[in-house]
């Protein structure tokens, strides 16, 4: 049997040659568990006459990827085979690739169609020797397979459908696209990105260096006017933004409600639903940058709007199609007054913004005074029980995961842009809180820090110094993007130049905890969570202050809280730790100002975290075993940290894999796994949601925008969701909830799981082991990042006289802080029955949180509601095909009763909980369950 080589020659298939090729790519991997011969055997079984060497490489990579469930190093080996294959099909010299991309001629039109901007091409030609020599192609071999396939699918530039770039080419294109002729900055950015310490957001990776470099991720749009002209002008704005790969947050608070008078035509309004269906179709039609991602609009509405009930039904799977808009994402912009009325079981008046103007333009006490004035004047459309509307919100969230929940007053009170006016919405992913207006489209450029890259494995500590320095580089990059960005609409350009907000996020917080052997819900993790975000906020302000010293503060700086010496943690009434010298930083800000109005905005990082091989943003792992889908098929992936631990303890086998699958990705009920390992690998479904919300509030004091906080509930009920929302609101969160994530009520039958093997794993007992060991760095991890030494810059801000951590990074013009101590002391030990010391892996469990406790009722039934017995529909009714009337008769289910009135006294406390961190949660039904 023959194989066809890339030059067209044919050669007999040789088993040893394939094995040798795979073996050459196994450097640095654990050869006790990685078997090149096993891969070759499976590849040979799939060989056919005339197969090409490229196809053999694809088959070998897919084979290694399928073996990832055996050991995580197979994911790196699979990527190396795929990368090696790509390297054979692409040019090595980056300047030649750029020349080819710039000189591209469209074969259909015969016209010059450059894929690289002229100024970028000319810059590369001027500095090609420096840029070409700076690229380290070996770094391509440290991606995991699924991260590399993500790059292949959407990020690497293609010529006539064939990939022309390598991953290192893309990173250098991004660096040059941002910094141009500043060679030192280019190489600094290239090195930090290629070493996987941070990544820019997807639009930046897509478009940097191209003829239309639209590098921004988020756009916040305000309706231009409540008129046909205003609505369709806004629609065009949304289409232009979506065309350029931007996600959109649109507020419609000021669009008149159904039945409102229209003076121009002497008619009445159809309300917001028909209008939103037009926006829905635009989102479907105008995708983000040539099918890279679908168009995405989030629609924000305040809950006093008279069409709010119809709004909540837009994404439901049942009901009339003409009143549905399932491609839009829904969000509520909730004033505190509404939460108070729900808590008190009070009345809530629905109003039309045309008849009760100004409500969207004020917040806090001013909003409450105006709203109550309209109530007293009888201008409302309809008065309902606040809990009736609350029930409708929870019902929609249970069915669809929407609407998102953001608290208007917290967003405005704790914003550094409060001097600009009332903020009316967030963005698509609920982490951007910026001022928008009819003549201003708010914009945000994003990047995320890979928190797992700053682990000092040698000392089992966290390297805050390195994190501080890299954060400053990220801030400078994002600030530069504001100036070189191609804006889809002039309103976005005007806004970004005036206020200069940026969004620094994170990914891999869960990986950082696992690398340091900290359970997600431990005291040590809670402390590290605060210190990480305190470090990022301090570093971001440091860099922005230095930029202001060089270039001046942003145009609307005067009158902002920061200009008055008020930082984000001051607005939360929080005192920072002694990790950094905030007094000196405030003194410098008072002297020079800051260049950017907003700095931190932890975003979801869905795609970029997959590229870098991290868990998403600040979330726990959702499962310890899951599916990854690529064009080649579906692959099972096991949490790589868990897999290494189980392999080292001799517990990993097919039977163990099947047991974890049978447990839905959990290891908590597997007797053979030690308890400290179980504590380390709790999934998000097994961690108290109170812990998740509390950690969000802890880091919130150092996040001047907001955060994309998902809520996970295994079996959601109205009582649980109510508990969660009120806890977040009381703790001062800006984003109370991004998505509500739930699990299916029933698991599918697992035909592929061997039940006999499961019983075998049940019979095994946990092996004796001496507690959690210090984790060594995984394959493909860069443990030492050394750039040029810092030669200039302002004095360090960190407190001096403390012990150091790991290898420093010297970066140009970045203030290098003094070394900082590790985040936590060595854990206290407990003595087990056999006198062996064992680390304390989690604190004592506090009183249960209602949202974490199982409840037997239907997800649509409140915890205090009686369970209603339902009857089967008789066959005559089915034969007559009678439809439901729920969309015709608005009053078919009034739900006007007090949803807690018939409950025992303890259960009536659910909606009236005054939960706060100092209170005893066990005294409250909402918190204790």
Curated annotation (Swiss-Prot):
It catalyses: a 2'-deoxyribonucleoside 5'-diphosphate + [thioredoxin]-disulfide + H2O = a ribonucleoside 5'-diphosphate + [thioredoxin]-dithiol. Gene3D superfamilies: 3.20.70.20. SUPFAM superfamilies: PFL-like glycyl radical enzymes, R1 subunit of ribonucleotide reductase, N-terminal domain. GO terms for biological process: deoxyribonucleotide biosynthetic process. Belongs to the ribonucleoside diphosphate reductase large chain family. Provides the precursors necessary for DNA synthesis. Catalyzes the biosynthesis of deoxyribonucleotides from the corresponding ribonucleotides. This is Ribonucleoside-diphosphate reductase large chain. The gene is rnr-1.
């Amino acid at each position: 049997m023959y194989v066809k080589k890339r030059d067209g020659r044919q050669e007999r298939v040789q088993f040893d040659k394939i094995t040798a090729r795979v073996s050459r790519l196994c450097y640095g991997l654990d050869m006790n568990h990685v078997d090149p011969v096993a891969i070759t055997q499976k590849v040979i079984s799939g060989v056919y006459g005339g197969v090409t060497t490229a196809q053999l490489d694809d088959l070998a990579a897919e084979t290694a990827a399928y073996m990832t469930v055996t050991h995580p190093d197979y994911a790196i080996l699979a990527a190396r085979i795929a990368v090696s294959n790509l390297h054979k099909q692409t040019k090595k010299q980056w300047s030649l690739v750029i020349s080819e991309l710039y000189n591209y001629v469209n074969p259909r039109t015969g016209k010059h169609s450059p894929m690289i901007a002229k100024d970028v091409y000319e810059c590369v030609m001027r500095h090609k020797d420096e840029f070409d020599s700076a690229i380290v192609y070996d770094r391509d071999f440290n991606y995991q397979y699924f991260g590399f396939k993500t790059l292949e699918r959407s990020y690497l530039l293609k010529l006539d459908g064939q990939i022309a770039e390598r991953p290192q080419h893309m990173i250098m294109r991004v660096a040059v696209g941002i910094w141009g002729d500043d060679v030192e900055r280019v190489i600094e950015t290239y090195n930090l990105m290629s070493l996987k310490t941070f990544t820019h957001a997807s639009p930046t990776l897509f478009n940097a260096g191209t003829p239309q470099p639209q590098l921004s991720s988020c756009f916040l749009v305000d309706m231009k006017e409540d008129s046909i002209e205003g609505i369709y002008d806004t629609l065009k704005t949304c289409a232009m933004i979506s065309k350029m790969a931007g996600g959109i947050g649109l507020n419609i608070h000021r669009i008149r409600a159904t039945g409102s008078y229209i003076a121009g035509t002497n008619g009445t309004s159809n309300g917001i639903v028909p209008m939103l269906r037009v926006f829905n179709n635009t989102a479907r039609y105008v995708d983000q940058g040539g099918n890279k991602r679908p168009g995405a609009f989030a629609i924000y509405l305040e809950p006093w709007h008279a069409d709010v009930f119809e709004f909540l039904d837009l994404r439901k799977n049942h009901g009339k199609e003409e009143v549905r808009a399932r491609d839009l994402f829904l969000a509520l912009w909730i004033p505190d007054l509404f939460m108070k009325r729900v808590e008190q079981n009070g009345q809530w008046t629905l109003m039309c913004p045309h008849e009760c103007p100004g409500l969207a333009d004020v917040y806090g006490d001013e909003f409450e005074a105006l709203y109550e004035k309209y109530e007293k004047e009888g201008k409302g459309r309809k008065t309902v029980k606040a809990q009736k509307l609350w029930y409708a919100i929870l019902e929609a969230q249970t069915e669809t995961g929407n609407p998102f929940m953001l608290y208007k007053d917290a967003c405005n009170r704790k914003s550094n842009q409060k001097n600009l006016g009332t903020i009316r919405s967030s963005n698509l992913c609920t982490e951007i809180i910026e001022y928008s207006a009819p003549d201003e489209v708010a914009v945000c450029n994003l990047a995320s820090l890979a928190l797992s890259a700053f682990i000092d494995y040698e000392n089992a500590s966290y390297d805050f110094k390195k994190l501080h320095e890299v954060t400053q580089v990220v801030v400078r990059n994002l600030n530069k993007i504001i100036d070189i960005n191609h804006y889809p609409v002039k309103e976005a350009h005007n806004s970004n130049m005036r206020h200069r907000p940026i969004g620094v996020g994170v990914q891999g917080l869960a990986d950082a905890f696992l690398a340091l052997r900290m359970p997600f819900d431990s005291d040590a993790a809670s402390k590290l969570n605060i210190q990480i975000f305190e470090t990022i906020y301090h570093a971001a302000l440091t860099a922005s202050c230095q930029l202001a010293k060089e270039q001046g503060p942003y145009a609307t700086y005067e009158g902002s809280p920061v200009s008055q010496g008020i930082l984000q943690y001051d607005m939360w009434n929080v005192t920072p730790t002694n990790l950094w010298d905030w007094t000196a930083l405030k003194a410098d800000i008072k002297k020079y100002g800051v260049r950017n109005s907003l700095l931190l905005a932890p975003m979801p990082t869905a795609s970029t975290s997959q590229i870098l091989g991290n868990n998403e943003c600040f979330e726990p792992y959702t499962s310890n075993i899951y599916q990854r889908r690529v064009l080649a098929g579906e692959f099972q992936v096991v949490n790589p940290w868990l897999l290494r631990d189980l392999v080292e303890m001799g517990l990993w086998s097919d039977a163990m894999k099947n047991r974890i699958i049978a447990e839905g990705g959990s290891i908590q009920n597997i007797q053979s796994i030690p308890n400290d390992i179980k504590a380390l690998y709790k999934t998000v479904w097994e961690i108290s949601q109170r812990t998740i919300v509390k950690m969000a509030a802890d880091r919130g004091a150092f996040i001047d925008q907001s955060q994309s906080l998902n809520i996970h509930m295994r079996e959601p009920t109205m009582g649980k969701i109510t508990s969660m929302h009120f806890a977040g609101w009381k703790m001062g969160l800006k984003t109370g909830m991004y998505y509500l994530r739930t699990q299916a009520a029933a698991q599918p039958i697992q035909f592929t799981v061997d039940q006999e093997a499961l019983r075998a794993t049940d019979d095994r007992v946990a092996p004796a082991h001496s507690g959690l060991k210090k984790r060594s760095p995984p394959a493909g991890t860069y443990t030492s990042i050394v750039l040029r030494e810092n030669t200039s810059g302002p004095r360090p801000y960190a407190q001096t006289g403390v012990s150091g951590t790991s290898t420093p990074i010297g970066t140009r013009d970045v203030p290098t802080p003094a070394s900082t101590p590790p985040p936590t002391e060595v854990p206290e030990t407990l003595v087990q029955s056999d006198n062996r010391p064992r680390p304390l892996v989690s604190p004592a469990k506090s009183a249960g949180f209602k949202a974490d406790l199982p409840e037997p009722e239907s997800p649509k039934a409140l915890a205090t509601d009686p369970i209603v017995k339902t009857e089967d529909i008789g066959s005559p009714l089915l034969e007559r095909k009678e439809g439901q009337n729920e969309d015709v008769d608005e009053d078919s289910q009034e739900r006007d009763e007090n949803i807690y009135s018939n409950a025992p006294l303890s259960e009536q406390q659910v909606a009236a909980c005054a939960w706060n961190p100092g209170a005893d949660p066990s005294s409250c039904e909402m918190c204790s369950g």
